[in-house]
Structure formats: C-alpha cells, structure tokens
C-alpha cells in the first residue's frame, strides 16, 4: 500500500487564498481551477508525473504560480 506524501495543507490554503484575492470573481476562479484540473487529468491520464498529487491541488499551485509570475514581470 502506497502512502501519500504529506502536503503542507497550510501552504496549499495560502496559495488558494492568494488565488482568490487576485480574482475579481470568486465563482469564476473556482470554475477555472476545476476546468484546469479536469483538463490536466484527461491530458495526462497515461503520463502521470505525480500520481499522489490530486489534479485540483496541482491546478491551484500552477495558477497561483502564474499569478505570482505576472506580478514579478509587471514590477
């Protein structure tokens, strides 16, 4: 039986909160995260990089990284 790696839930919550704070519409960003997670799940169905990381968590991390990169570029 494989054991899931312990994700720092406070870090993921921080990322999700950062994502929500940058969004003008909480519903829209929630739908975007869900759509990205669904798309990534089907795109990488055969080629799974990290089978222990859920697609939703991966989508939150990726989207918050994109927001922080935009902030870095604009500064």
From Swiss-Prot:
Keywords: DNA-directed RNA polymerase, Nucleotidyltransferase, Transcription, Transferase. It comes from the Bacteria. GO terms for cellular component: DNA-directed RNA polymerase complex. GO terms for biological process: DNA-templated transcription. The keyword Transcription applies. It is an enzyme of class 2 (transferase). The keyword Nucleotidyltransferase applies. Pfam families: RNA_pol_Rpb6. Its EC number is 2.7.7.6. InterPro entries: DNA-dir_RNA_pol_omega, Pol_omega/Rpo6/RPB6, RPB6/omega-like_sf. HAMAP family: RNApol_bact_RpoZ. NCBIfam families: PRK00392.2-5. In cyanobacteria the RNAP catalytic core is composed of 2 alpha, 1 beta, 1 beta', 1 gamma and 1 omega subunit. When a sigma factor is associated with the core the holoenzyme is formed, which can initiate transcription. Belongs to the RNA polymerase subunit omega family. This is DNA-directed RNA polymerase subunit omega. The lineage of its organism: Bacteria, Bacillati, Cyanobacteriota, Cyanophyceae, Oscillatoriophycideae.
């Amino acid at each position: 039986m494989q054991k899931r790696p312990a994700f720092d839930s406070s870090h993921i919550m921080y990322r999700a909160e950062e994502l929500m704070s940058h969004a003008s519409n909480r519903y829209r960003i929630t739908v975007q995260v869900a759509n990205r997670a669904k798309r990534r799940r089907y795109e990488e169905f055969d080629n799974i990089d990290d089978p222990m990381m859920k697609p939703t968590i991966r989508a939150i991390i990726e989207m918050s990284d994109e927001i922080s990169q935009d902030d870095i570029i604009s500064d």
